[in-house]
Structures are given as structure tokens and as C-alpha cells.
Amino acid sequence: MKLTILFGGASFEHEISIVSAITLKEKLSNFELNFIFCDQDHTFYLINASKMRATTFSRGEYKKMPKLTLSHGSFVQKSLFGSVDISGTVLNLIHGGDGEDGTIAAILDFFSIKYIGPRVDASVFSYDKRYTKWLCHARGVKCVESQELSSSEHSNIKIAYPIIVKPSRLGSSIGVSIVKDESKLDYALDSAFEFDNTVIVEPFLEGVKEYNLAGFSAGKKFYFSIIEEPQKEEFLDFEKKYMDFSRSGNVDSAEISKELESKLRASFEKVYKNLFEGALIRCDFFVVNGEVFLNEINPIPGSMANYLFDDFGGSLKLLANSLPHTKRAKVTYEYIHSISKAKGK
């Protein structure tokens, strides 16, 4: 199968995207892969697979590689001797802004390029944590209570301590702080507001169980990964999550009851259905006294959560063959022709 991995982007998670792409190069060695890098200036480069290493990007070596443009149906490499289409379904692996906020989805849709990843509407609901909670309420999925703050409401906290403070539109624990009392609040808010103009405050739930579940739908059927119980620490900071994005070995399935497994899958389906088709996503859940709460949606999970699937390559092939088709207007110019005919022109 031909697959084009699109990575990079102009976001705070740019480097994580590079790590994910390098990881998938090894994981998908039986695929016919192309690699397209989007730099911070939104220029696209075709990266030779042999150059897929971190220093290619940190040293700026990618700038010596072919630049790409977009045309109907594909990315294009132009040269003095003509142009070459970069064929294959695109895998959107740009984490954070650009990739998860709907920007790349809109561009790929505009040029009718087939891709695996969240569509524009799905991106809107998963990228902004405020809208994720609205989605949960609309679909009957429980989520943790929260308070939204703008920079003008700097310390009007109504939730009891300890709390967790996070930017509305960032992942990978960037700008996230646990605040155990009011003395640490201003610093946490200042840190979060460095990355966004809106902040979400939630109660910090201690002693809860956490579970991660990835999946997708294809042919009106859901396909799920194993359920992972992530390593138990009070808080995974950016560096720990950065290392987590390079995972490629499979993990052990959580030891949970069939009842809880069914609850987690049911919540996943409610979130996914009629919104995330075409994407492989990961949902992170809290379980409190047997009740399931959605913590967050990862529309483009680190390294595509490959380590949660027994047959990750097979899952991607299945998804690539079941991508949604957008109905497009057929332009016929009938109206203009009828007016011209009536005027005798």
C-alpha cells in the first residue's frame, strides 16, 4: 500500500510530529511510504526515507530537499523536466495547530486529496477542550466539570482545590499545571495564558483509574484497539509525553471487567459516530466509582497509537479503503447558459 505521511506543521507540537513520523517509518516498513514535511513557514518538502532522522530537521537539512506544491488530487514535485504527482493516501500526522485544528483537513479537502485524519468539523470539536465538553453533553457522554477563564478573569476560580489548569487548545501537557492551593495559582495561569487566550480549569481527580482506547470505523463497523491503563503518575509532563510519542512496541491490555470494557467502547462510539469517520483517534478516559468520564479526544494520537493495535498496518489499510466521500457540487453553468440564450447571445 502507498501511504504519504504528512508531518511537521507550525505548532508547539512540531517536534512531537517529527518523532511520530520517524517512529511510523519503522513500524510501517512493509508499506510504500512517502514523507512530506511541513515547516514552520508552511512550505512542503519531500523527504527521502533515508533522511528520516531528527537531525535532518533540527539542522535545517530538509531545506535542500524538493519543495512541493498542491494540485487536484495530490502533492506535486515540479522540475525542469515536468512534474510528478506524489501518489498514495495521505496520513495527517501533524499534531497540534495546523494538523488538529482543521487547517490541513481544509487544504486536503479543497484539493480533493484522500487522507486519513479528522475532517474539519471533527477537528473543531476535538481541538478546543471547551467544544469537546459541549460534544459530550450533546451525546450523553460524561466529562469532568470545568470552568472557562479568559485573561481578564485571572483568578476568579470557583472550583475547589486541587485543580488542574490547561490551555483550551493544546495537547501533550504543554502549559498544564496542577495547583494544590491558591498560592500557586497565578504562576499556573500565567503559564497557561502563554499558549492560549482561554484556559480551562478542572478539579484534579486523585485516585482515579485512567484508560486509553483507540479505534476507528470502517464499513459501518467499529474496530477497537486494546484498552491501555497508562503508567500511574500524578502528572505526565511534556518531556515524558514526548518520549511516549516514540513508542512502537505493543503494550499489555488492561485487566478490566467485560462490563467496563463495554462502557468504554460505548462512550467511544458516541464520541466518534457521524463526526470522526476517516480518522483513527484515541480517547482518554477517567473511571470514578465505575462511571466513565471522557478526559480528552486525541484526533491524531502520538505515533497514531500504533502500540495499542495487534495489527496496526492492517488497521490503516482497512481505514484507507473506507474513507468518507464528500459530495461535491457539479458545476454546469446551466444558469448562465439559460440567461445568455434568453438574451440571444
Curated annotation (Swiss-Prot):
Binds 2 magnesium or manganese ions per subunit. Its EC number is 6.3.2.4. One of its GO terms (cellular component) is cytoplasm. ATP binds at residues 160-211. Residues 133-332 form the ATP-grasp domain. It is found in: Cytoplasm. Mg(2+) 1 binds at residues 284, 296. Signal peptide: none annotated. It catalyses: 2 D-alanine + ATP = D-alanyl-D-alanine + ADP + phosphate + H(+). Pathway: Cell wall biogenesis; peptidoglycan biosynthesis. InterPro entries: ATP-grasp, ATP_grasp_subdomain_1, D-Ala_lig_Van_CS, D_ala_D_ala, Dala_Dala_lig_C, Dala_Dala_lig_N, PreATP-grasp_dom_sf. Keywords: ATP-binding, Cell shape, Cell wall biogenesis/degradation, Cytoplasm, Ligase, Magnesium, Manganese, Metal-binding, Nucleotide-binding, Peptidoglycan synthesis. PANTHER family: D-ALANINE--D-ALANINE LIGASE, D-ALANINE--D-ALANINE LIGASE B. This is D-alanine--D-alanine ligase. It comes from Sulfurimonas denitrificans (strain ATCC 33889 / DSM 1251) (Thiomicrospira denitrificans (strain ATCC 33889 / DSM 1251)). The gene is ddl.
